[in-house]
Amino acid sequence: MHILSFIVPFYIILYLLLGASITATIFFIHVIIVPLVFKYSKTFQRGIVFSNFLPVFRDLEDPASSGLDGARNLSIEFQSKVDNCRIKIGLWHILPKSVNERLKTMLQSTADKEELNSIFDEELAKSKTPIVLYAHGNALARTAPHRVLLYQVFQKLDYHTIALDYRGYGDSTNINPSEDGVVEDLLMVYNWIRTIIDKSDSPPPVYIWGHSLGTGISSHLVGNLDTLCASLLDRPLPQPQGLILEAPFTTLEEEVANYCVTPLVTWLPYFNYFFLTPFVTRRHAFKTVTHLARTTVPILILHARDDIIVPYALGEKLYKSVKQSRGGTVLLHSFDRSEGLGHKMICAAEGLDKIIGDFITEHQ
């Protein structure tokens, strides 16, 4: 009931400042219109979950303009069985530091895109270092500054990085995303990687890294990989060597219930029905805790205690639930409030390279 100690004075102040008519209108919107829109508008729900309507101000075709050295822009296309249409997915491939240094002169002198792609593909195919497939969270695109900082961490660790934009994001096909759709996108990029590296007698290890909403997408993929391959691909795929979840949640329903502005409506007697039930259906449920119970892939969870977007308590709850429900490694590394990392800046955490390196070295 503590939120009412804010709500009641707030409306009293509005009444004194704006008068009864305007205050009543605001109250009506607050307690009637907002719940109805939240419950019944699929467009609004999709916007809340994916936030892919936010503009992108960086050049997707030129990774160097975002501060990345030794990177290429490319795309893959496939026929989507989820949306029954052709889908193009935009990607960045960032080379490991050692490979970039070795090829720097050649890359700078190569203007032909096909030749450049051939060089990158060959390096990926014969790689002896890990590959990280990065699944970003909602809003913006693969160009977002905090994402670029993380790619640079991977590059310094001498890993290949593959970063994609799902349908509806960046320069990928502009259609409405759904949980099944973005999971299909991640699967197709993972399949593209495996197609290249599985030609080798000893392919490099592949790890999937998800952040925020990307943890729900990557967990859905890894937890149901065999089923997804059977329904969406014409071949099985091996599991990745590990799954790294940055700022994960248990289910989208619990994330909405614990979101930082949710207390403004939790006092409403119909809160659960109007605000939570829309996120129980398959359209966008992201039941990470259920998906992860189906796989024994090693998992590393990273979460900052001062995260107000996805509260630390949800990451900790996920860790405990998964640890009880399955075998295999499940690790949790928390970052103290004093570090001020919040929801997006674990990429700048002191010692992050060692945390990642230790996990990947242990699970190759």
What are these regions (language model features)?
Residues R294-T296, L300-H303, D307:
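Short beta-strand/loop motif that positions the catalytic acidic residue
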Residues G210-G214, S218:
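Gly/Ala-rich beta-loop-alpha elbow adjacent to hydrolase catalytic centers
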Residues P205-G210, E246, L302:
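Short beta-strand immediately N-terminal to the catalytic nucleophile in serine-hydrolase-like folds
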Residues H220-H291, M345-A348:
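Hydrolase active-site cap/lid region
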Residues Y312, E316-Y319, Q324-Q364:
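C-terminal catalytic histidine-bearing segment of alpha/beta-hydrolase fold enzymes
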Residues T23-E115:
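An N-terminal hydrophobic leader/cap segment in hydrolases
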Residues C85-W192, G216:
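Membrane-embedded segments
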